[in-house]
């Protein structure tokens, strides 16, 4: 498992720290709340579409598999649909965190830091593909995909927690 998470952590750090090289400031939205939120929500479409793809995989499988057509509420389900549902559930969990992180990031962070959002979204979809492809191989097969999906969001949420706590403390202290 470590073999998958270490490269994912490295790619996350490289992506988020190297983003100024990849994405010039001129491509960012104007520094206005509506434009910032539009930027975040545009990129939030990537995790949402990843979730849609996961749901579609479950639906397509059910449509073509008589043992699974009745749905999870009425049948136990084949091992394949159980795996597809687990992937969809994990994608839902990751997408909720990512969309929240992108939105809060866009509202709270300096304009130049908005470049992190498209990198995080790109890593998200790459991670979801690798996670789904590796799922059958257990934790080691999922590790890289999970890391690429989760780590950018976790880093963003941790940074937001630090920045917003710092701002709140300064506000309370009257600075």
Stretch-by-stretch model annotation:
Residues 22-25, 122-138:
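Transmembrane alpha-helical segments of integral membrane proteins
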Residues 101-129:
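Hydrophobic alpha-helical transmembrane segments and immediately flanking/interface helices
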Residues 48, 89-102:
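Core segments of transmembrane alpha-helices
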Residues 70-94:
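Short membrane-interface loop/juxtamembrane segments of multi-pass integral membrane proteins
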Residues 158-175:
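Juxtamembrane boundary at the C-terminal end of a transmembrane helix
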Residues 1-51:
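Long, highly hydrophobic alpha-helical transmembrane signal-anchor segments
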Residues 53-78:
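Membrane-helix interface/capping segments
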Residues 130-155:
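Interfacial loop-to-transmembrane junctions
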């Amino acid at each position: 498992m470590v073999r998958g998470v270490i490269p994912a952590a490295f790619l996350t750090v490289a992506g988020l720290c190297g983003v100024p090289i990849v994405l010039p400031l001129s491509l960012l939205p104007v520094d206005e709340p509506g434009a910032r939120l539009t930027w975040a929500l545009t990129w939030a479409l990537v995790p949402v579409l990843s979730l849609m793809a996961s749901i579609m995989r479950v639906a397509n499988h059910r449509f073509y598999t008589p043992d699974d057509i009745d749905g999870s509420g009425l049948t136990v389900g084949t091992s394949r649909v159980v795996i597809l549902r687990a992937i969809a559930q994990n994608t839902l969990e990751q997408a909720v965190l990512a969309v929240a992180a992108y939105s809060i990031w866009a509202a709270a962070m300096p304009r130049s830091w908005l470049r992190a959002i498209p990198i995080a979204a790109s890593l998200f979809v790459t991670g979801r593909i690798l996670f789904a492809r590796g799922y059958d191989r257990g934790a080691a097969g999922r590790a890289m995909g999970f890391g690429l999906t989760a780590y950018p969001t976790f880093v963003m949420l941790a940074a937001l927690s630090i920045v917003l706590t710092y701002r709140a403390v300064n506000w309370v202290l009257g600075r």
